[in-house]
């Protein structure tokens, strides 16, 4: 996960190339799918195993398996690895009997990879966002990603590596 380059078209045409993407494609195509889903308030996602084509995350779907976005980022990433391994083994075992499904491109959403400066939480956010929204922004930007931060007086950055949130 985290592949940021397009595989050359001549490779895609010559070989049966597949990829795992941590979103329920066609939704959340492109970069930073985990962060974008959590920031958008999604609670559930899916790992999608798909056949690569020339477009970004737009190939035919081989398998798609749901997983929860709840918990800290380490837990979420662990679930993604577990589901991705399961789907890869399933594909290898059933390779000659795969039933690929076309993506509904009309339902596609495409996101760019988040930039470190987008990890900033502004003081105004505490007046406009809910506690859950701020918590989600902090937890989806835990290591190994650029952590959420607040810029303090004098330009010093206070990094927010973890938050706890209690629903009432």
Question: Where are the model-predicted features located?
Answer:
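Internal anion-binding site segments
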Residues: 103-168
